[in-house]
């Protein structure tokens, strides 16, 4: 009994040192992104219509959006509170992780005729910035994924832009005004159908 006591104490000391070492270790990208799965799905592919898929998202855009949530520049229901728990370095790690994931377009219904109209409107008003129909592209930078996103999410995001709860770049604002003047809200519905059709 007395001989085993020093061994037990040694084992306990080694275990305590190991726990202390792990507690001070930098969190990995996988650890940081675990909290995202509840809304954005495993590996960044959303299973809920109100949340965007963030797999293969452009890293610069990811960090910019997260910083916007953290500062309050981008309005949100919950993301602002979540973002406050992370540093810029954390955002960069998370961005690198999601960039490496494979994007899976949402499986959803859409109106085929409306999608055909939307494809033409996309080419006219959106393609210059959202190339290849808004798909994620390996060699592009500063892109936002539209193709295959859930339609309700795109509708909510557009509402935020139009009601100035989210900042909009000048080029986008100009093209949106042109689209709405020519097509009205029906033009947006056609665009949403086009993005939904890319599955």
Swiss-Prot record:
Processing and modification events after translation: Binds 2 heme c groups covalently per subunit.
Signal peptide feature range: 1-25
InterPro entries per record: Cyt_c-like_dom (IPR009056), Cyt_c-like_dom_sf (IPR036909), Cytochrome_c4-like (IPR024167), Cytochrome_c_Oxidase_Subunit (IPR050597)
Key word NADP present: no
Job description of the protein: Diheme cytochrome that function as the electron transport subunit of sulfide dehydrogenase.
Subunit architecture: Dimer of one cytochrome and one flavoprotein.
Name of the protein in its database record: Cytochrome subunit of sulfide dehydrogenase
Organism: Allochromatium vinosum (strain ATCC 17899 / DSM 180 / NBRC 103801 / NCIMB 10441 / D) (Chromatium vinosum)
